[in-house]
Each structure stands twice: as structure tokens, then as C-alpha cells.
Design a protein with these regions (language model features):
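Class I SAM-dependent methyltransferase SAM/SAH-binding core
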Residues: 47-49, 53-100
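A short acidic, Gly/Pro-enriched loop at the edge of an enzyme's catalytic core
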Residues: 103-111
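A short glycine-rich, Lys/Arg-flanked "PGG" loop and its adjoining helix->strand segment in the class I
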Residues: 126-138
């Protein structure tokens, strides 16, 4: 049974951090690694898409205590949990979809998204990435930490399974429910380049 995205995470808030750190492969490695790639200059402006409870920020703020972070998430409960962790930090939190929230122009030194963007098609991502590109300052960059489909067939299978479940439950295409539909690295790269990013580096 598919669940609406915000409700899915709110229903799992208790124990969420522990699940992410112990139940997701290599989480103890990719959260610190992601944080190490973010800017550390005093007052760096960082946008966190789908920030949840701020697990990546737990690793980032020790590296840049003066960072000014804007976090966007669908779940108000998740953001409230994040807020309690960082009462002394410069954080602006926005409840909403990062597809809909205005981001401005030349605002951020970097943007980051961890385990959040694997729910969307390439065509859905391109307008978002264009908006992100506009919101980044000169020499700004996006860090995307996520998992990807190994093959085109796997990517399409995820999408087909989602469409079948939506049809079974009578869910419209414009309704946002939780189901993983990761792209291949190649398709993700194509989306970023089409959106205007000059290059894509895969570690």
C-alpha cells in the first residue's frame, strides 16, 4: 500500500535516525563524506533538499559552525526534530516541496540532497535542477548523495511497478506517494547537464 510522502516519514519519525544510520548500507561513510564536500568558508550558504532530521548537518556543522543553512522538507515533524538538534545554528527551515519553493538567484554556495531525489523521473528532475542551477552562486555546486538503478531495465521496472500500484489504488499522477524509482547514473548525469550544470563528477 503506497503512502503519501510526508505521512510516510512522519509515521516513521520515531527511530528514523537509527534506521538511517544502521539500516542503510554505508550510511556511516556517506554522511561524513557528503559533509566533507560542502563549503567550509565562514558564513557559507548551503541549501539542503529533503533535509529530514538533518543527519548530514550533524556531520557538516562541526566542519563549518558558521554555515547558514536553508532546509526544505515535506514533513513538519522531521523539521521540528532537526530544529531541536541545532538550536544555536543559523538555519532556515521550510515545510514544502522543493519543486514548488522559490529558491531565488545567486543565493547559495552549495546545495545538497541525501537520499531524497530517487523518487522522480528524469523529466521531472530537469526543471528542479534548472532552478537549483539558477539559485547557486558562481562556482556553486550541487552534491547529490543517493542510490541509483544499475541498468536501464532496473530503472524501468521500478517505474512500471509504481505505475501498477498507482492504478491499483486509484492514485492520480499529480499525487505524491512514497516509492523508490531511482535513475541510472547515466540518466541522472544527463538531467544535470541538460539543466545547465557544466560538469558532473561521480566518485
Amino acid at each position: 500500500m503506497l503512502e503519501k510522502m510526508a505521512e510516510f516519514f512522519e509515521n516513521r519519525l520515531n527511530g528514523y535516525d537509527e534506521h538511517m544510520m544502521t539500516g542503510i548500507e554505508a550510511a556511516d561513510e556517506f554522511y561524513p563524506f557528503t559533509a566533507s564536500l560542502l563549503p567550509t568558508a565562514k558564513g557559507s550558504r548551503v541549501l539542503d533538499l529533503g533535509c529530514g532530521t538533518g543527519l548530514e548537518l550533524e556531520k557538516y556543522f562541526p566542519l563549518c559552525p558558521s554555515a547558514r543553512v536553508t532546509g526544505i522538507d515535506l514533513s513538519e515533524a522531521m523539521l521540528n526534530a532537526l530544529k531541536k538538534k541545532f538550536t544555536d545554528k543559523d538555519i532556515t527551515l521550510i515545510v514544502g516541496s522543493y519543486f514548488d519553493v522559490p529558491l531565488g538567484e545567486n543565493v547559495f554556495d552549495a546545495a545538497v540532497s541525501v537520499e531524497s531525489l530517487h523518487h522522480f523521473t528524469k523529466d521531472e528532475k530537469i526543471p528542479l535542477y534548472k532552478k537549483l542551477h539558477t539559485a547557486l552562486r558562481a562556482n556553486g555546486y550541487l552534491i547529490l548523495t543517493d542510490y541509483f538503478a544499475a541498468t536501464d531495465d532496473e530503472e524501468q521496472t521500478h517505474r512500471n511497478n509504481l505505475n501498477a500500484l498507482k492504478a491499483e489504488q486509484g492514485i492520480r499522477d499529480d499525487e505524491f506517494y512514497h516509492y523508490d524509482t531511482p535513475l541510472t547514473v547515466q540518466h541522472e548525469t544527463e538531467a544535470l547537464l541538460e539543466a545547465g550544470f557544466a560538469s558532473v563528477q561521480v566518485p
